[in-house]
């Protein structure tokens, strides 16, 4: 009898978890176009992720010496290209002459927006890379924010979800004041907890991108009660993807989009995953 009760309890628990997983949707998006599988932040990477079924992307934007917006993560060129020096002190033409370490070309915002503009069901995080802060004094920061916002919104498909994100909260505050209603996300290198939730609320943003290690299900539930949308990072492995889903994240980045999608389809078909 005890054994039968245990089996029934286990079945009921599994059914409960499965029902919850089916009700909860997690959107997985391609971080820098899937930097561990493809040539990060290049048009080739975004196309490869799109071809794999992804409609969610994260991109990093910096300002060149002559005022153009380039898609790149680091403030320096050495890690990802055959060039050297600081992005913000290099002209767009100089950057266009470089090759990435995988033989590609650096992407610029206009070509990315042109590629996105006819696509349906997009979710794109435009991360404002305005650190080191000495490269972006207030006047330069405002020029950067205005140009980025205006270019992105002028080319936004009607059904797209475009979000401006940053770990430099100066840009978030400026956009919020200048463009009321803009969709903003605070990025933090700390886990989701009481302090980071309070910080997001104080900034007046509706989204928080928190580090997954140290984040609990209770913290995610509290953030949801506070009206916050939760995005978790990093996404290096399929285990990271599973942890993000377990924690109850709304969004989750991944550096391995193809591997994660294959894993989810084959191993966790009960999860309600959107790409």
Q: What positions do the PLM features span?
A:
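Bacterial Sec-dependent N-terminal signal peptides
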Residues: 1-24
């Amino acid at each position: 009898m005890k054994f039968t009760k245990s089996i029934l309890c286990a079945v009921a628990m599994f059914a409960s978890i499965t029902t919850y997983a089916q009700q909860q949707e997690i959107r997985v998006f391609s971080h820098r176009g899937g930097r561990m599988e493809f040539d990060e932040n290049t048009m080739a990477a975004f196309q490869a992720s799109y071809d794999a079924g992804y409609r969610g992307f994260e991109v990093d934007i910096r300002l060149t010496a002559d005022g153009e917006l380039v898609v790149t993560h680091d403030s320096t060129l050495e890690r990802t290209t055959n060039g050297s020096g600081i992005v913000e002190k290099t002209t767009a033409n100089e950057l266009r002459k470089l090759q990435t370490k995988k033989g590609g070309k650096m992407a610029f915002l206009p070509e990315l927006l042109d590629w996105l503009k006819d696509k349906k069901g997009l979710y794109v995080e435009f991360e404002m890379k305005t650190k080191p802060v000495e490269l972006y004094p207030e006047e330069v920061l405002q020029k950067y924010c205005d140009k980025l916002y205006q270019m992105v919104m002028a080319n936004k498909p009607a059904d797209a979800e475009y979000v401006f994100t940053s770990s430099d909260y100066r840009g978030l505050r400026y956009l919020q004041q200048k463009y009321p209603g803009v969709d903003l996300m605070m990025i933090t290198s700390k886990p989701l907890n009481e302090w980071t939730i309070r910080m997001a609320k104080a900034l007046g943003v509706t989204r928080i991108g928190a580090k997954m290690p140290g984040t609990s299900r209770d913290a995610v539930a509290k953030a949801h009660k506070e009206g916050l949308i939760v995005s978790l990072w990093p996404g290096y492995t399929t285990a990271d993807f599973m942890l993000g889903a377990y924690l109850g994240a709304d969004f989750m980045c991944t550096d391995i989009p193809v591997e994660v999608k294959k894993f989810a389809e084959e191993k966790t078909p009960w999860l309600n995953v959107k790409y």
